[in-house]
Amino acid sequence: MQFSEQWLRSWVNPALNTEQLSDLLTMAGLEVEETVAAAPAFSGVVIAEVKECVKHENADRLRVTKVDAGTGELIQIVCGAPNVAVGVRVPCALPGAVLPGEFKIKPTKMRGVESNGMLCSGKELGVPEDVDGLMLLPADAPVGQSIRDYLGLDDQLFTLKITPNRADSLSIRGIAREVAALTGAELKPVAIEPVAPSIDDVRPVKIESRQACGRYLGRVVKGVNAAAPTPAWMRRRLERSGLRSISAIVDITNYILLEQGQPMHAFDLAKIDGGITVRQARAGESLLCLNEKTVELQPKHLVIADDAKPLAMGGIMGGEHSGVTVASHDIFLESAFFAPEAIAGKARELGFGSDSSYRYERGVDFALQRDAIERATRLVLEICGGQAGPVVEEVAELPKRQAVQLRAARVAKVLGVAMSAERIGDILSRLSLSYTLADEVFTVQAPSFRFDIEIEEDLIEEVARVYGYNNIPADAPRSGMRMLAQPEDKRPVDQLRHLLAGRDYQEVVSYAFVDERWERDFAGNDNPIRLQNPIASQMSVMRSTLIGGLVDVLAGNINRKQPRVRLFEVARVFLRGGNGFDQPEKVAGLVWGPRLAEQWAAKSERVDFFDVKADVEALLHPIKAEYRKAAHPAFHPGRCAEVRVDGKAVGVIGELHPQWVQAYGLINAPVLFELDLAAAIARGRIKAQPVSKFQPVRRDLALLVDEAVTVAQLLSAFAAKRAEIVADIALFDVYRGKGVAEGKKSLAFSVLMQDNSRTLTDEDVEPAMQALLEAASELGAQLRV
């Protein structure tokens, strides 16, 4: 909403400058988007009357004038405006004046004739003006007075961003009421005296749509001069509020809208057949609106109709046929209350709106209609003349205000400020919120203009606004937090996330609601936990594995031409359990594409099972896991392993099944893992080990074993018989081919031995190696020579 600061200060004038007033309104919830000057800066311009005006002897289009500018003598000024004439009063820039754009006025000669000033147009002063030529002022404009003072050009224009719940602030009356409440300044509203009827003419009013229209007032005014000019003061206020002047009657209704907040409409009485009825539109009816758009009316549309036809769309826009023109002599003034729910959304459906619909759909004061019609009638009689008939009023169903309770203790708790009941009561009174008080509990009745007071929190907000948010102390809350001991056998989940991110994985977060197909394909789950009210058909069950979500993200990245994808997710899965549902946490990862990002130093190779196995080992470190061949519906039958810790299965690792690679359009198979989060964050009791200062000894052990014997079996056998000096055993080569019999394979292990107290000798090393060889022989292994 845009309005003039001077207009507001005629209602309430707090001891604040423009900037302070702007800040006050913003902090009270009426955000000031901008303030701009009503006119650009200029000086030295006064009101002057043209006393003489003759044709310039050397120029056909110039006039030589002598003007009275209140200086005590006539001033000669050469002027080229077409509307300059004897007797007109106009703005006059005297020598030394500075006009917008730093244009300085000084004595000069024009075609040989001396000119000591400049007669100004509105454009030259930066003031909107419809007249082509000089700005013509009223005949009673005081000669010699500064034009800035006379036109109020030192005004500031405020633009407020009013929230939808504060329709009561969409008027000068409403904003002034707020400023008075916030500052304690005296509110000086316009006195509204009822206009005594001087004629008996009426038009009967009937409300059929009683829930949509709670109150309707109408008044006949006859013998008006609709062509009368709108007073300059009213025109200025309208223009500074963003509305253009149209005609006196229309300007008056718009003025009431801005001043009082009550939308009004004026009908040409001669175009009304019979009485006025507020009803729903009927099938087949249409209306040509004031914006020259024809609306095919529907029963959901509220209309103002006479005995023969619709005249206007209630609360939205009047009709072109029944509108007032400068030729109108008799008018019918309308002032009504329409329920917000009856108007809301209708203008947007039609593709156009109005200032009236904007206010009605947010809520207009349902006690304001009579004041508005009396104020409008008074202005019509003063500006356009005429005789007014009595006001006809019909009341249907008006909103009912429920009392709201406000506890003083609750105010203190929410705002963090101890406030006495007297202080709270004073704030409520300043906001026109009537109340009764008993046992520190206020029972508050909201006024007719406040549609947003419904619950206790609404009242607490009002108290806070007037008390001032800046006055609420910024007290930091006292916390009872204390540092908790961190268990040594577990690590934080965030540390696990950082570890995976450090290994070039990117974390994803996916929905726990998944496609039923994913559960069947990746978990072999034919009885997933179903949602009673899924948000989409493809999100109808709860996941029991994280694999489906990772595969889906991979498919999306492949479609976007990503060459290399490494993902992980930490989240819950949902399983059926003996006592209902279990929600264990899992960590899962997926790797697809080249092992390394494209570079010149290494050949591009696809990631494989063992790359991801290394990531899993790093994830579980220092705990050693055992890997056993396994079958899983999501994984390749021959490239899948169960991850076991202390003899218990804690996860699975493998290459995605070729069937799902093809079904989900993945080009080639990713390698995935999924682990119980509890196993992934466990790290065992850390035991400090001294660093030996003696050189280690390495021996290699090459064994021929059957294809069925796994590395894990051999490592397990070694562990049972390894000597104390054996620090580490690692596989470094697997060979099949020439020199190795069919059905056999060669496995080569490096054995690292070290003692913390001495250098090892062959006498120490050989028994240790022999013990390992004996352990391997129990699995049918032979030393390869």
UniProtKB/Swiss-Prot annotation:
Required co-factor(s) are: Mg(2+)
The keyword Cytoplasm belongs to this UniProt entry's keyword annotation: yes
Species name for this entry? Chromobacterium violaceum (strain ATCC 12472 / DSM 30191 / JCM 1249 / CCUG 213 / NBRC 12614 / NCIMB 9131 / NCTC 9757 / MK)
InterPro entries reported in the protein's UniProt record: aa-tRNA-synth_II/BPL/LPL, B3/B4_tRNA-bd, DNA-bd_dom_put_sf, Fdx_antiC-bd, Fdx_antiC-bd_sf, NA-bd_OB-fold, Phe-tRNA-ligase_IIc_bsu, Phe-tRNA-ligase_IIc_bsu_bact
Which family is this protein grouped under? Answer: Belongs to the phenylalanyl-tRNA synthetase beta subunit family. Type 1 subfamily.
Q: Subunit arrangement? A: Tetramer of two alpha and two beta subunits.
Keyword annotations for this protein?
Aminoacyl-tRNA synthetase, ATP-binding, Cytoplasm, Ligase, Magnesium, Metal-binding, Nucleotide-binding, Protein biosynthesis, RNA-binding, tRNA-binding
- A Gene Ontology molecular function term of the record: phenylalanine-tRNA ligase activity
One GO term describing the cellular component: phenylalanine-tRNA ligase complex
B5 domain location:
399-474
Q: Where does Mg(2+) bind?
A: D452, D458, E461, E462
Q: Which GO terms describe its biological process?
A: phenylalanyl-tRNA aminoacylation
Q: Which reaction does it catalyse?
A: tRNA(Phe) + L-phenylalanine + ATP = L-phenylalanyl-tRNA(Phe) + AMP + diphosphate + H(+)
Pfam families documented for this protein = B3_4, B5, FDX-ACB, tRNA_bind, tRNA_synthFbeta
Q: What is the lineage of its organism?
A: Bacteria, Pseudomonadati, Pseudomonadota, Betaproteobacteria, Neisseriales
Note describing how the cofactor binds = Binds 2 magnesium ions per tetramer.
The record's principal subcellular location, in a coarse class, is: cytoplasm
Asked if the keyword Protein biosynthesis belongs to this entry, the reply reads yes
Q: Which residues form the tRNA-binding domain?
A: 39-148
* Identification of the protein by name: Phenylalanine--tRNA ligase beta subunit
Q: Where in the cell is it found?
A: Cytoplasm
According to its UniProt record, the EC number is 6.1.1.20
Domain FDX-ACB: start-end pairs:
692-784
